[in-house]
Amino acid sequence: MKVSLDNYQKEAVYINDKNILVVAAPGSGKTTVIINRVNYLVTELNVKVGNIIVITFTRAAADNMRSRYKNVFNRDIAPFFGTFHGLFYKILLREGYNISIIEGGISHRIIKSVLAKYSDEVSEDKIKEVLNNISLYKTSLKKLEEFNPTLSKDIFIESYEKYEEYKNKNGLWDFDDLSIKVITLFKENKLILNKYLNLFKYVLVDEFQDCDDLQITFLKMMNKNNSLFAVGDEDQCIYSFRGSKPEYMVTFDEIFNGGKKIYLSINYRSNENIVEASKEVIKNNLKRNAKLIKANKSTNGLIKFSSPYDERIQGEEISSIIEKSAYKFTENAVLYRTNMEARSIIDTFTRRKIPFVLLDKGYNFFDHFICKDILAYLRLAINIKDRENFLHIINKPFRYVSKSNLEYVRTYREDKCPFDILIDKKDTPPYQAKKLDELRKDIIHLNKLSLSSAIQYVISELGYIDYLREYAEKYKQSLDDLEDIVEEFKSAADGLRTIIELLSHVEGVKEKIEESKEVKEGVILSTIHGVKGMEFKNVFLINACEETIPHKSSMDENIEEERRLFYVGITRAIDNLYIFSPKTQRGKFKDTSRFVLEGGFREIEVNEDYGIKENDIIVHKAYGKGRVVEINKDVIKLDFGDGINKSFSLRILIENNILIIDK
């Protein structure tokens, strides 16, 4: 089959230099170039398929590329298409090593057992963070004393040592061990190295910008007299937390002798104005190759920037656009910086019956340990005899209830209030019995408060914020990040009146997320990291605010990676791009992201008041009768009584018949 190539692609496919870096703009056809390069090597240069390896970063990408190569060029036999780890596994098997890869569940249990010594509850996020730090350390080529983990150094070292001890004792490997062993083997045994140098004459690497130090070391070892054909884009390097570095793209010609850079400049994916706007953003980065990027399409799509009052109105606007659109649900993607931001979108889509697909299928905001803790307090308020939730909260903050006493409560046979179990225990000191009784009364008191007041009472009066301070210090974690979870939880409860309503809402969200796992035709919800390499007709990039994107933890030394992340997000769009920057997030006023300003995105002002005035009485379909407190451009503030004040997009309410004036 004849494949049509543009001039940039032809130069990349047919060049005969030894070491080539193809710098590929988004949507520029890098997979087309790679499979055509392989075909050129086989048909024109008569290279044996056994002398070619094509390395990708995921098995799915490798399978897709192999399949396309075979189908496009009608081949029965293909060279190796696979990941670095897949290649290293094959090498070690060939050299006689017996390899058993450690199961993910076992890794989790090892780390959890270490972390459990420092905290009663160990979150999945914390386990993943430790395992990621272990991987980052092993691939960094640094000594242990030189490595700075993102958590407590003592906890990291203990976790690392226990993890390695278990693997060594049971003859197990992880993927990083495969990399380390192959490189060590090649360094120590020149005969084996030369064997593979003679075998791997042509090495092709996809997503070169994602290579870590160990992978670059391997490629350099394979490059003695062989050819390297690397394809990537430093502007899409968004995995520094895994050890990838854009510098390898920029300094390619210094690392690999005689290296030459070729640029794929035509974006075949996006409408012209989306390409032009994305260029305005990414040109502000310094760690990049200067390059020409241009759109193949001469058409302009819709680029809309909106600055709604808050995240709820943001969700309403997105819902209205999708509902009125002729596009299929699956052609829309809502993208965000962190998983937590999906919470408000899920709420809105659930209420408006818009089907969705969570790419991170296991994510539920209410599964975060902070949410579980606050919910445990509230459940205990509903049922003071609830032993499970009593055990969950009693030492958050630490209330000097020993592990033996916790076990005593857990195994107590009679159906008795857990507070009374400890208070009536003979060896419980009077002062502790008094404290337990006071805590019981405080928890029962939660039932008399409004939901928002009850949540705040748990955080402030019952000392949960003190527990979070201790947690942050112990695990070397940002207290601000933990407080963001608390504020998001408060936002989730906004509009609900009672503890029972909140508990029902949490169960409803859980059910909806479970249902979404079976949904085939739904709007895609994902972090920007999760959609790299994908494309959608319509992209909705939400919460484009300072301290969200760029994230507040990356405002200084990692600002270029944050800009790359924003760039990756907006370049997923084929037809239309919608960017939202709420004026408030979790009740706090926010500045519009600098990346929005760099891209020249501008909001269209909405000044229509639809004849509604302050103090008018209206009826909202969801909240009932209310009074207009204030109208400011498109934001209408309504008072529904009982202390419930809400802000909405006036245009959304009117256009969707959600609000009517009560005559």
Q: Where do the protein language model's features map onto the residues?
A:
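Conserved helicase NTPase motor core
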Residues: 2-14, 18-22, 61, 80, ...
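Walker A/P-loop NTP-binding motif
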Residues: 32-47, 220
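Conserved beta-strand position immediately N-terminal to the Walker
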Residues: 20-21, 52, 262, 332
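Conserved helicase C-terminal RecA-like lobe
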Residues: 377-589, 593-598
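A basic/glycine-biased coupling hinge at the interface between accessory DNA-binding modules
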Residues: 18-19, 25-28, 41-186, 190, ...
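C-terminal accessory regions
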Residues: 544-644, 648-650, 655-663
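Conserved beta-strand -> loop -> alpha-helix junction used to position metal-binding or nucleic-acid-contacting
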Residues: 76-91, 354-376
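Helicase P-loop NTPase motor core
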Residues: 26-34, 257-260, 265-356, 382-383, ...
